[in-house]
């Protein structure tokens, strides 16, 4: 996989079965790991992202996609609550806050079925 893709180019590659969502997600996770010293991400949800990617690949095989972006990984700003995921807003005061609800923003991404990799 090359260094970077646009949203549109990834959607086309997925649509034409040139690459799977799991492959894209795995590559993004590797890039995040390789750039860890940059300290760009507060939380990385590798397991959840890979499960979401596999589900997307299954939907693609059964031609049951929820959007043309189904399966393209995304990072979510650490200001938006995601059920069961530590949400700190980069504040030490919130370092242990794990919401039991979804924000409107994360519900929208879930509807598009984008594998959520990290919280920035």
Q: Can you say where each PLM-predicted feature lies in the sequence?
A:
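Conserved small/polar residues in nucleotide/adenosyl-binding loops
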Residues: 110-116
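Flexible, acidic active-site loops/lids enriched in D/E/S/T/G that coordinate Mg2+ and/or position polar
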Residues: 46-69, 76, 99
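Enzymes and membrane/adaptor proteins characterized by extended Gly/Ser/Thr/Asp/Glu-rich
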Residues: 35-36, 68-105
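Short alpha-helical functional segments enriched in proximate histidine and acidic residues
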Residues: 31, 35, 52, 56, ...
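Residues within well-ordered alpha-helices
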Residues: 9-10, 104-106
């Amino acid at each position: 996989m090359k260094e970077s893709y646009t949203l549109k180019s990834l959607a086309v590659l997925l649509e034409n079965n040139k690459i799977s969502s799991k492959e894209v997600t795995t590559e993004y996770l590797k890039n995040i790991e390789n750039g860890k010293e940059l300290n760009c991400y507060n939380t990385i949800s590798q397991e959840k992202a890979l499960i979401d990617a596999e589900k997307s690949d299954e939907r693609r095989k059964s031609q049951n996609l929820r959007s043309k972006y189904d399966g393209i990984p995304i990072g979510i700003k650490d200001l938006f609550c995601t059920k069961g995921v530590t949400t700190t807003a980069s504040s030490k005061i919130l370092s242990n806050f794990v919401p039991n609800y979804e924000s409107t923003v994360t519900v929208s991404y879930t509807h598009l079925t984008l594998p959520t990799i990290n919280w920035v």
